[in-house]
Design a protein with these regions (language model features):
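Class I S-adenosylmethionine-dependent transferase superfamily signal
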Residues: 143, 260, 332, 336, ...
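Helix-to-beta-strand junctions that scaffold the AdoMet/dcAdoMet cofactor pocket
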Residues: 147-148, 340-342
Length: 384
């Protein structure tokens, strides 16, 4: 499959107009929507423009990995793909794709786990380059391992999120990696000639200080390390109240969920995250430490019933994609306030400069500081 294509080949064509119309209709929901954040960027458009000829010649089916809100999947359909197999780690991204597909009347795609998205017939993959190198390695290995022997990967992102090391990672799974010129502050990498590789395994680290083993699938936040926000919550875990049902919200690798389960073995502990690799990692971490945890992929606490938790622990993200934004954390505070029982507690760690206390008091209830460093603050909020 050739991936060579220039802007001039497509400018003013009916397909170009149809693609522009599609992209203009896309929204981010249920992701954060603001005037500054939109559902596609120049990297998506560059990737689609470049891949147009390859899509038309790919035999009908294309694989898309890492689509953020549906631009690549729905764009590939506009450009002639008869079916798109999609893998994305984020449940928010999946829901945004489904919402945009319903809005635009497109349905010829299917959602898959990473180890199921490729087929031996897959010849073309459109990949939104992740910033995490271990995640990129896992994705590249899966494509090279499970795709057609002549599979081509066209990968892209904005320049500010790219490094030369990404080229090196791709070269570990593909013999040829070509680098495009920059366009609108975006760049593409095209990988061909897959090597004989195996799937990347999870990583594992023992943290003796807290007597915990961390197991992490590629791409989970902080990997198999103890991030300093989680450490701050562990350091005050002896002050957590008693609980019959507790939730690690935004669980990442599940260290806090494991601590909750070890501290009160009879409790029902839920580890919840929007990320598929986080949920898988939390389950593996719990198993490695001999405890039982219910690992759930969810947007916030949307599947949890009102007033059912005694304790929620939270180390919230402060980015929406690459942009610093408080919107995700504030949504999680609201969810926690809804799911906590009267008298239940939310223990939160946050970057001190973000000053979340007013938002916590609005969403949950009276909030007091438990500990503070120049970088992190731990608070406890009590549901009235």
């Amino acid at each position: 499959v050739s991936a060579d294509r220039t802007d001039d080949d497509r400018a003013g064509s009916p397909l170009d107009s149809a693609l522009t119309t599609l992209l203009d209709r896309l929204r981010r929901r249920p992701d954060i929507e603001t005037a500054e954040l939109r559902a596609w960027d120049a990297a998506d458009r560059y990737l689609l423009d470049t891949a147009a000829a390859a899509i038309a010649r790919a035999g009908g089916e294309v694989v898309v990995i890492g689509d953020t809100h549906g631009a690549l999947t729905l764009g590939a359909l506009v450009l002639g793909a008869t079916h798109v197999r999609v893998h994305t780690d984020s449940l928010v991204a999946e829901r945004a794709l489904l919402a945009n597909a319903a809005e635009t009347g497109q349905s010829e795609f299917s959602l898959h786990a990473l180890d199921e998205v490729m087929t031996p017939e897959t010849r073309l993959v459109l990949l939104r380059l992740p910033r995490a190198l271990d995640q990129l390695d896992a994705l590249a290995r899966e494509v090279a391992r499970a795709g057609h022997g002549e599979v081509v990967v066209i990968a892209g992102n904005m320049l500010k999120h790219m490094t030369p090391t990404q080229n090196d990672v791709l070269r570990e799974s593909f013999e040829q990696v070509d680098v495009s010129l920059a366009r609108s502050k975006a760049r593409l990498l095209t990988a061909r000639r897959p090597r004989a590789v195996t799937a990347r395994p999870a990583s594992e680290t023992r943290v003796d200080e807290f007597d915990v083993t961390i197991v992490a699938q590629p791409g989970v936040f902080a990997g198999a390390t103890l991030d300093i926000g989680t450490r701050a919550l562990l350091e005050v875990s002896d002050q957590w109240p008693t609980y019959d049902r507790a939730i690690d919200l935004g669980c990442g690798s599940g260290v806090l969920a494991t601590q909750l389960a070890r501290r009160t073995p009879a409790a029902h502990v839920v580890a919840s995250d929007v990320s598929a690799v986080a949920v898988a990692s939390a389950a593996l971490t719990a198993r490695a430490n001999g405890v039982e945890v219910e690992a759930v992929r969810d947007i916030g606490l949307s599947t949890q019933e009102d007033g059912t938790a005694d304790l929620i622990v939270l180390n919230p993200p402060f980015h929406v994609g690459a942009a610093v934004h408080s919107g995700v954390a504030e949504r999680l505070f609201v969810d926690a306030g809804r799911v906590l029982r009267p008298g239940g507690q939310l223990w939160t760690v946050w970057n001190s400069h973000l000053a979340y206390t007013p938002a916590l008091e609005r969403a949950v209830g009276p909030t007091r500081q438990v500990s503070r460093t120049p970088k992190f603050t731990v608070t406890v909020s009590r549901k009235a």
